[in-house]
Amino acid sequence: MAISLVTIIVMGLLLYHRFKLALEKTAVDNTEATVEGTVDRLNADLLDIRQIFNGANYNVVQQFDISSREFVEQFSLLYETNSDKVQSVALYDHEGKLIASEPVALEKKNVQVQTQEWYKNAENAIENVHFSTPHIQELFEDGAYRYQWVVSLSSYVDVNKGEIPETGVLLLDMKYSVIRDVMKQINDSSDGIYYYLSSQDGEMIYHPRGTELNRGLFKENSLEATKYENGTYEIRADGQNLSLIHISEPTRRVVI
């Protein structure tokens, strides 16, 4: 009788353990599906922005003389068509002087364009399109004194100016809301977990508790994600919290 009772207890524990593992696996699978879906949405939005940037470069900047009416019209049309995602688009010459911008706005005084990270990155690696981390746009005057959060795309480009070939830097500021809205949606529908997005260097791009992070009231070990290559992982951050990381590209990491 005692042996049978022990056997029943052991079998019960084994069944419970397997049931618990099955539940944990289901939870992880569901979480992976959510993360992968989020990554797909972010990639689609960022690919769209990249295509808008390429359109500005190849179909406008390199297609028309910057002094022509066609250039002005097409530059304006490109912005107006994509104003739901684009905060502004601007073209600068090799000395950092503004050639064109949409929407048309006054430059802020004492802004040293050539010292901006997006400008320096474009100059240092002329064949690449560079994505910045989120920041407040400080290039143009805003009559309503609003602070616009953006992610900047920049690249060194060829500029048509009469018979003289020149170079410059094309800047497209994507509205930060493009990323924020996707991340906010999955966080609003999550149950007891949260998702954040960081860069390849561990810099925070989006966090649902971003205000607390900025004030030092909350900490996040985003550097842990920089150790991993493309894929989905389970890790322990700070020796306690179980996290799942999905890396779609070397530049972005969605972390739970």
Task: Annotate each PLM feature.
Residues 245-256:
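Single conserved hydrophobic/aromatic residue that forms the stacking wall/gate
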Residues 70-82, 169-212:
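Solvent-exposed, extracytoplasmic
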Residues 119-129, 220-235:
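Soluble sensory domains of the PAS superfamily and closely related sensory modules
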Residues 100-110, 131, 204-224:
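GAF sensory domains
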Residues 17-51:
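Juxtamembrane membrane-water interface segments immediately C-terminal to a transmembrane helix
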Residues 43-73, 89-106:
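Extracellular/periplasmic ligand-binding regions of membrane signal-transduction receptors
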Residues 1-21, 25:
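Extreme N-terminal signal-anchor transmembrane helix of membrane signaling/transducer proteins, especially
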Residues 59, 83-85, 99-174:
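Extracytoplasmic/periplasmic ligand-binding sensor regions of membrane-associated signaling proteins
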